């Protein structure tokens, strides 16, 4: 094939020089020696050694040329000690960077051992970073060691050159590294390849594969390495071509980059960096060749290490990592001779067409390292693809290179093309560890591509990407940041992790720590050396480095999405898994185009950034485009909700398509790309960057929160568009909910959303408050969580965003919840989104009033829940993604749940449970899922449902209280969080009392709802979990049932605290009632619970019936939207009804979600629940059921029911019993048939009757959408007809369980149904009782199991 000379050339060695030849010889000998030394490592030797050896050999060649090379050669492995000394800079710059590339391509192969060894050595110096990178990259250590080993020399001797080289290399990394590795690889290398080898990328890849054995394999390393002097002539041919192109660039670090890329580095890049491109095409051969490629990865690793070590080192490392990949050899020559020295000239000899941009970008970049890197990349790519320059370069090879390297703009397409292949491998690391950014790196590369894509192309394509251009500094920085900072630490691996995990604290997560740290460190340090060149510094430099973490967060969010995107591109399903983690954030960013844009901008710097402004409208539109007609309708209805929900859906559900466009906007990747490119993203993306940075754990929000807790301020600082993140994002995010968002986000923004707001749009901010509530402390990251989907929202924020999207008021919250949920089941979520839009609208006011407290709590929760949120988000996303699989969902849920629980407790309990709950519930879909009830909902899509549900505040709180109580029966945590959520006044006490009662309710509600919940909590979590995925559409149905169950639960919960029949009856769904004194008037209670004035009519049984009618459980879809809407309208207004409705809605969502799973659980639980309901309702005490969960609740329940009968709402109880008693007489089947339409009618009446502030038009439209969704759900249900029947059963059960409120006016239908259910229930009540303990145990087990899951950060990250 090609001799080592070729490899050297490709690596950037100027073989034309004699020293490079001898260098080649020396490095080859050295590499051969190293290979021999590491011969035992086999491929690892070949691969790991190959790139490392090449890096060393080329390093020596580049730096020491013969002397260093020979010295190194003398030291066969030398590994970085001699090499690092002499050729440390070169090796670090070029080969150390290249080996990381190689490692990127084959992290598990030789990389592992090699980097292990190297990492051991390297770890000494930069153990944390190294470890992080290793963790993030699984192969970073190999790079690390060489990099670090060389870092000493590099940093010391090569630091000057690094500084000089770094800008070029960095630019090359940005452009070349990301684009260069793909495009430079494609074009730069193609140029040499085409010029010298005339080989296409595929050919080049094959060449790599063929060559790799020679170059990196024992053949080249041993035979060719030593035997052959790397025939300079052969190398010279490509080198000449490359050098010809690069001679000046080499001077400017471009030619080194270019030639190295073309001959070896480019192939390496293609091989490794191109792993994105060729992905698994040449895993081993490529890894072999990836050896040289490894250096980029190594550079990334080094960057992450270097960021810690020193800005310069990191810059040089990053640049080296990327640029040196290509220009290691040339770089070495550059280092050796003055050729490389002139960075400015480097710009001048731009063989890339985007050079002008790059040049501009380079100038833009202070160090120009990043910009120059981009420029070189673009130059190289432009040289190869002159037209590709700004758009093409940024886009085409940007994607390809950016994917591999840092080119953000173009990697997306190329990434999709090439990255998919390799993304899976990287995805695996990425999936297992978000911060293992290799796959995420690629994912991030895509995102970075998008980011860097816009960034790098912004540098390179600043003209091309106007939208990005506005963020040029930010864009460039972001793109530069991801490639430079992210790629530096883990361009491939770290980059993504850094963005994805950058959220924790930049490198808060160990996984992404290297990147994040690198990024943060690099960010902090890079700004010095490469503040401008560093994308991060460039852009984050724009935004305070204090927000560096935010930027990191942004990157983190990007990373997360990138992970998802990368995964999506490589493995869409994998992406889905990742997406769910990402989904939360994408929801906001994508759903809330502005927010998400901010976050997504963060995530998809370029595409998203451009989308930034578009994203909300255009992205939503695009989201609608991708959405089904109903989804579109819903989106139109809810404004951004549909889009955000779509984002969620697409993010979680349609990761594949999205993946191409925006890693962050998985679903909307393509759409988002267009939108992203529209230019809204510059600010938003940056805003989201901060948000997104913590998006995994929602540190972004948190980080943003510090500076940008005001919604826009920090974000504004971050980006212009972010200036009014809450209002602007909310508004932009959801034109529809803009007003609401503005209202709500204003308060919320400032309080809880201030961080979220900055993080994402107001919708998210609203939702982010909810979502960010957990992440609010990590508000910056929260929206990152939420909008960047807040990725943090990812757990909750995204959900919230989605939730918020349906309605302006609801948008924020709902968007998040929805986003998360959407992926699981779009229809129910759509409906829920609309319903939540209503709820949000209604709750918006409530939240407006409680926004401050809510924000406060949101902040609190955010703080408490940053990781939890992330986990919850991941979990939620997992629920969304894995919601399809019960286990996954169950596992994710619990993980989220436990984390959420404390958050919920702290934030939600503290904040007005209601407003906070509302917010959090959307955002706390994550928290909710953590809550067993939440989990269920989330599992079944209920959490997002809950989130999406505007009523989530009361309802979710109720459900959280009830569900939480249900789960509390299984686990105290849920109670806490239920109490937090459910209790305005009865924070934990109520919850805990509710907990005993919940156990009782677990029998009663659990028998009915919790029976479905505890009994079915397990089935739902497991059985239902499985069904939930399938039954997500049924979640509306379940939602109906959830209404019953929620009401029941509210009853149970309410009784838990208040144990007052009034609560059970009056506010079945009003968990708050528990805390409320029984004497408190319904209206007062409603006002207190809802935090808004409630019309008395709303509180009346009729209104409750609206809430109950929402239980048109068979009509979960239509009913749910309307019921929830109506419920929202009526329920938010009346504390009691809203409470009941909300709880019922949440429960319905929950139960609806559980419903489909409940169909599993309903099958066991439907009887159980009706029986339990009968027991609780007919018997007035969940005696039979009660004993199952906990005897002590039985008294409570007994008392509760007695109170229900006697104490507080005798009328309700009377009605309840009437309905319960009457139910049997009513034709259950007829009622069932009629319940959907009837419920819809009821809801329509209700919605129209007390105009709960919901737009009548909107309500009508929502009803329409609901009908469509219901049809869809029914279609789903047709497949699940049994589930449907059981759903009705569950509805009946729910009615029986929630007789008071549910059986109210609308209870007739429900009561009839309930009667049917009750009759069935009586039959199976004994069975239910018998089953219930097991179910309860199951639930407890589930909770216990979930708890660990919810706390399992590894899993969250992994997912």
UniProtKB/Swiss-Prot annotation:
Residues 82-91, 98-112, 539-554, 619-632, 689-704, 756-773, 1003-1013 have a biased composition (Polar residues). Residues 335-353 have a biased composition (Pro residues). Residues 15-28, 120-135, 591-613, 868-880, 1324-1342 have a biased composition (Basic and acidic residues). Keywords: Cell adhesion, Cell junction, Phosphoprotein. It comes from the Eukaryota. It is found in: Cell junction, Adherens junction. Residues 1-147, 249-411, 454-554, 591-813, 840-1076, 1105-1141, 1157-1207, 1225-1260, 1276-1359 are annotated as: Disordered. GO terms for biological process: cell adhesion; positive regulation of blood vessel endothelial cell proliferation involved in sprouting angiogenesis; positive regulation of cell migration involved in sprouting angiogenesis; positive regulation of MAPK cascade; positive regulation of sprouting angiogenesis; positive regulation of vascular endothelial growth factor signaling pathway. The modification Phosphoserine is found at residues 1044, 1050, 1194, 1281. Residues 302-321, 849-859 have a biased composition (Low complexity). GO terms for cellular component: adherens junction; perinuclear region of cytoplasm; ruffle membrane. Signal peptide: none annotated. This is Junctional cadherin 5-associated protein. It comes from Homo sapiens. The lineage of its organism: Eukaryota, Metazoa, Chordata, Craniata, Vertebrata.
